[in-house]
Amino acid sequence: MRVLALTAAVILAALPARAAAQQPDDREQVRLAVADYVDGFYQGDSTRLVRSVSPEVRKNGYWRASPDSAYRPSAMPYPAFMRFAAGVQAGRNRPPANAPREIVIFDVQDQTASAKLTAWWGTDYLLLGRENGRWMITHVLWQSPPPRPATR
């Protein structure tokens, strides 16, 4: 009985170490999913979008047509992702040469993750879920770049 208790204690002690060992790999997989998302838009690569975005994605946000205009709500369903990528391939919707591509991973758990992307269109807050072993973007809340403070 004592051996059984000792064995159970060793196994239980090893479990957090194993979970922690998986965390960096999961963080990297989440980062790669977000990178596929932004590069899919920047390069017009629908393959990357298919690889990283759930067809059930919900993307909602707030955009401004110009720096002095008001924000307007905007929704982007999955088919619009593919149309946008096709537009980039056709020479429309291209990002500026110095377009930002900053990815910050906030949290990664066993089934869910969250991240922030700063891109040329603004800031995206992304929620990801593990679907069939892959990290997929399921929700995006975004906004155009905020107004810059007035200079004197």
Predicted regions and their residues:
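Short beta-strand edge/turn micro-motifs at domain boundaries
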Residues: 114-116, 123-149
